[in-house]
């Protein structure tokens, strides 16, 4: 195996280790670990494809540098080591219906890479995705849902989340978020970029759907002009 493949494998293992330490915290963690436990992640199944850099490299480096929580030290070190081995892609609304308006902030700076999944750089899987997701500072990831059940492991120090009609709530680094199939959710990013582990457990080819809320423009204006100090949590 190549050094690159070993670094990607180590990154996957660091995520699995964290999830195992938080088994039973959320139903989604147990389901995810069961799925991963049934996969063949042996050396001979590793993929070796060329890396792909990104125009958002400076934001990405800042996001990784901002992973400072002690419980995330292993993931942070492995991600830093493997960053230039990964295939980084932008979402240009290809996961949404044609014409979906995702907002200027999201369009300006979003990034993801798959470690396990379709077109992944670690291991191929036809109906499971595990990867890294990043958003630029002061971004609203508008309310949306999807058929794929989703687990987030937040790596950033703070990010705001809204689930359905609930109020916004801030979540710290190391927090786990479970979005059941079809459950609406939104994310707001403050002065520092947002970075997380994301996992889609099935239905990875399903589309995302915007769930309209009347306050999108107001939130985006506040994020762009004032930062997180204007929000009550």
Question: What residues fall within each predicted segment?
Answer:
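An internal, amphipathic alpha-helical element
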Residues: 93, 107, 136-137, 147-155, ...
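Double-stranded beta-helix
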Residues: 190-233
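A short, N-terminal "cap"/entry segment at the start of jelly-roll beta-barrel domains
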Residues: 9-125, 225-226, 233
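Conserved short histidine dyad/triad with adjacent acidic residue
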Residues: 113-119, 128-146, 167-168, 180-183
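Structural motif
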Residues: 158-159, 184, 193
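Short, conserved beta-strand element in jelly-roll/cupin
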Residues: 132-138, 145-161, 200-202
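Short acidic-glycine-tyrosine-enriched beta hairpin
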Residues: 125-127, 151-153, 165-184
């Amino acid at each position: 195996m190549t050094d690159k493949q070993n670094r990607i494998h180590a990154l996957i293992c660091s995520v699995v280790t964290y999830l195992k330490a938080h088994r039973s915290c959320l139903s989604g963690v147990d389901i995810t670990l069961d799925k991963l436990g049934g996969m063949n992640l042996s050396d001979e199944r590793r993929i070796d494809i060329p890396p792909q850099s990104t125009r958002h490299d400076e934001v990405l480096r800042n996001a990784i540098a901002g992973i400072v929580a002690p419980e995330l030290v292993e993931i942070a070190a492995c991600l830093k080591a493997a960053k230039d081995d990964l295939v980084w892609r932008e979402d240009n609304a290809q996961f949404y219906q044609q014409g979906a308006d995702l907002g200027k902030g999201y369009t300006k700076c979003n990034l993801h890479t798959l470690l396990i999944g379709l077109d992944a750089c670690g291991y191929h899987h036809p109906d499971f995705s595990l990867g890294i997701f990043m958003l630029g500072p002061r971004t609203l990831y508008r309310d949306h849902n999807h058929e794929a059940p989703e687990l987030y492991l937040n790596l950033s120090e703070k990010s705001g989340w809204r689930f359905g009609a609930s109020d916004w709530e801030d979540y710290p680094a190391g927090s786990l978020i479970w979005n059941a199939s079809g459950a609406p959710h939104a994310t707001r990013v403050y002065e520092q970029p947002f970075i997380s582990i994301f996992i889609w457990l099935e239905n990875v080819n399903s589309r995302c759907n915007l769930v309209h809320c009347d306050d999108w423009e107001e939130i985006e204006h506040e994020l762009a002009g004032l930062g997180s100090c204007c929000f009550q949590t």
